[in-house]
Amino acid sequence: MKYIGAHVSAAGGLANAPARAAEIGATAFALFTKNQRQWRAAPLTPQVIDDFKIACEKYHFSAAQILPHDSYLINLGHPVSEALEKSRDAFLDEMQRCEQLGLTLLNFHPGSHLMQIAQEDCLARIAESINIALAQTEGVTAVIENTAGQGSNLGFEFEQLAAIIDGVEDKSRVGVCIDTCHAFAAGYDLRTPEACEKTFAEFGKIVGFQYLRGMHLNDAKSAFGSRVDRHHSLGEGNIGHDAFRWIMQDARFDGIPLILETINPDIWAEEIAWLKAQQIAEAVA
């Protein structure tokens, strides 16, 4: 079964996120558990936690259908010690917030070397950062998102994701989220079913489908292999509809949150309905 949704707003309170997801016909959702552009946030109160859990139950969302995203400020591979510690503290707080909310996944961008340290050193720092957070939390999996490779961001090659996982001590609590726009911009072709087969065969060989814990379904304004991160609505960009139809009809993508971060929230309900229809079309066939 496919869990399909979008990254919805938690404005006005975390408990509003499940309702907003339900309104667009989603069976999954992503959210920020705090302001993503600030380092610090007030601790979660028992009331906020209870309200969120009640809303999830009301709208039939289990933890397996929810893919929280951490702050954009965090860089777990930062080359400067003081800044690295600040990011690690913030990441631990994000993991603990998920733990308090009964969530089991935390999606994050791996990190950037900022042209100051070697790629290998940065990847090792990211893995160490994950180990530190996992040692102080329980039940939450750190879900590494592939990047487009813009600037000095790492995680744009499957080999880089595999290297981070290799450095994580508890393999049961590390996973990967594949963003289709990022993959395409990083040079992994998705424009035809044959290209999708090839790209995900490579993913399976290098990373492994056992680590796939979520996906971001985005078309791309950016060109193939451009290393530029620019999302687009499904079928409107340079990837096209075929990739998303192919994903919907492949059982390897069952049981994980498939999250839209496409650029027009006004048509998310339509995009979700279209994705669901592709799945039904395969079942009928």
UniProtKB/Swiss-Prot annotation:
Note on cofactor: Binds 3 Zn(2+) ions.
Cofactor(s) needed by this chain: Zn(2+)
This protein's UniProt keywords: DNA damage, DNA repair, Endonuclease, Hydrolase, Metal-binding, Nuclease, Zinc
GO molecular function term, any single one: phosphoric diester hydrolase activity
Gene3D superfamilies: Divalent-metal-dependent TIM barrel enzymes (3.20.20.150)
UniProt: Zn(2+) 3 binding residues: 182, 229, 231
Function recorded in the entry: Endonuclease IV plays a role in DNA repair. It cleaves phosphodiester bonds at apurinic or apyrimidinic (AP) sites, generating a 3'-hydroxyl group and a 5'-terminal sugar phosphate.
EC number: 3.1.21.2
Record family assignment: Belongs to the AP endonuclease 2 family.
Name of the protein described by the UniProt record: Probable endonuclease 4
Name of the coding gene: nfo
Residues involved in Zn(2+) 1 binding: 69, 109, 145
Record field: catalytic activity: Endonucleolytic cleavage to 5'-phosphooligonucleotide end-products
Ion transport recorded as keyword: no
Binding site for Zn(2+) 2: 145, 179, 216, 261
Gene Ontology biological process terms in this record: base-excision repair
